[in-house]
């Protein structure tokens, strides 16, 4: 059975490695900036993504991360985006939720908790896809009468 694809957007190589190791139940696709994240999103079409808001060229701010969130949700509205946030970024994480992010997880990361949040995001995505499919079948059967 194929593993679910998870996009991890993180510019810290050490954290990328930690996430790849701790999330080995998924096919982890990594990006380290907005451009590579969008390329990976188009190429792999992951159902779930985790992302740091502090991405280059603004690693200490959130402008690049919030812009990427907006792009991801515009290109793939069903993708569940989980924000990985440091304590000083809490206000930015809440803004990201208001913009449409699925959830956020505080750094430093707790692998078990993050795994549960990610599993829940994949589950919700699958339920929403199934619901859409059933609504389409129902709609098609009305027209077939």
Features from the language model and the residues they span:
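Flexible nucleotide-interacting loop at or near the entrance of a catalytic core
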Residues: 116-145
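Short amphipathic alpha-helix used as the core "switch/output" element in two-component signaling
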Residues: 39, 58-78
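Two-component/phosphorelay signaling modules centered on CheY-like receiver
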Residues: 12-35, 43
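C-terminal output helix
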Residues: 91, 105, 109-118, 126
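Active-site beta3 strand of CheY-like receiver
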Residues: 44-55
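Alpha4-beta5-alpha5 switch/output surface of CheY-like receiver
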Residues: 64, 89-92
């Amino acid at each position: 059975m194929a593993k679910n694809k998870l996009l991890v957007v993180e510019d810290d190589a050490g954290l990328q490695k930690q996430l790849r190791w701790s999330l080995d139940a998924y096919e982890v696709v990594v990006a380290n900036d907005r451009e590579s994240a969008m390329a990976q999103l188009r190429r792999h079409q992951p159902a779930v993504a985790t992302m740091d808001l502090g991405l280059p060229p603004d690693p200490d701010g959130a402008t690049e991360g919030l812009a990427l969130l907006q792009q991801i949700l515009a290109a793939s509205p069903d993708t569940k985006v989980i924000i990985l946030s440091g304590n000083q970024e809490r206000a930015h994480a809440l803004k990201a939720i208001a913009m449409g992010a699925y959830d956020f997880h505080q750094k430093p990361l707790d692998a078990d908790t993050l795994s549960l949040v990610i599993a829940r995001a994949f589950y919700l995505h699958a339920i929403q896809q199934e619901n859409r499919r059933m609504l389409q079948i129902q709609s098609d059967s009305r027209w077939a009468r």
